[in-house]
Structures are given as C-alpha cells and as structure tokens.
Amino acid sequence: ALLKNPYDVIHSHYWISGKVAMPVAKELNIPLVHTMHTMARVKNLNLAEGEVPEPMIRVQGETQVVAAADALIANTDAEAASLVSLYEACPDNVLVVSPGVNLKVFTPGAGRAAAREIVGLDKDSHTITFVGRIQPHKGPEVLIRSIAELVSHSPHLRAKLIVNIIGGASG
C-alpha cells in the first residue's frame, strides 16, 4: 500500500513504532520524524524508590531511533535538552512543538453546563484533575500540597472541590 500511495513523511510515536518506521523510511526514501513522548533514560534518572528501571532494549531502541530520525519532536525545551544530552541527538534536528488544544475549535458541543451534567458534576463545583503516570517527576504531590494549601486558606472551598487523580505506573 505504501508503494502505491507514497507519503511525504513518516511520523512515528514511541520507540517501538520508531523501530518499525526506520526500515520503511529508509526503503522508501521518506524522511522519518519521531516523537518520543517518554524516554527511558529520563525515566531511569527519576525512579522512585522500588521502581523498576526501563529495560536496556528500550534504551538501545530509543538510541537507534534518535540516530535514524531526520527530525525529532519534543514537547518542551527540557525534553529537547534531554534528547541532545542523553541521546546525543543533533540539536538542529530537534524541534519543540508544545502540545495543546485550540479551544475555539474543540469545545463541549452543548456547553460547559451540559458537559458537567453528562459526567455528573455539580454545576457549582470546582474540579481539578491530574492525568498521568503516578511518578515523582510528574508532580502529583505538587497538586496534593497545593490543594491542601488552597483549602487551608479558603476552607469554604472544601465543600465544592472535586479532585481527580487519574493514572498508574508506567508500562
């Protein structure tokens, strides 16, 4: 199918798809753009006590993908710096593209009140949500400490505050 419908670029996400994309990009002479999303070396540098490090096969795979990619997309300046310092990525090949949502385009169709009703949230509640891996470098404890501070200064918020922490270990 790729030979009949040529593409201008292959954009892989995560190291496993990057490994699959590498020979395809080479065979078809198509530039490979890769987004890591997470990096084993970064995760291994930030392990909490008792956490299992990412396997060496992942580190090796990520290193190979970084070397093969024509361009690397990082979500933040810190992520870009990690690609350069930990994986020896060429700085000229690393581009920072911050993730985000265009709120003028992507809004609850029926409005905020209807969306709250659909998911069972009180219209007067204040909702704070953390979504991500529950790991120290993701900062869930910052949220918890901040909420404790908020409630200590504004006790009236306690009755209307809904805090969601959604996530688990990586893997």
Language model feature labels by segment:
Residues 40, 53-72:
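Membrane-proximal helix-turn-helix segments that form the acceptor-binding/catalytic region
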Residues 25-45, 73:
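Active-site proximal beta-strand in glycosyltransferases
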Residues 107-121:
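A short helix/loop element that forms part of the nucleotide-sugar donor recognition site in Leloir-type
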Residues 78, 100:
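Carbohydrate-associated surface elements
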Residues 101, 159-171:
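Glycosyltransferase donor-sugar binding loop
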Residues 122-138, 144-148, 163-164:
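Conserved donor-binding/catalytic core segment of Leloir-type glycosyltransferases
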Residues 10-11, 67-76, 95:
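A short beta-strand/loop micro-motif in the catalytic core of glycosyltransferases
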Residues 2-17, 21, 30-33:
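Short N-terminal targeting/anchoring amphipathic segment
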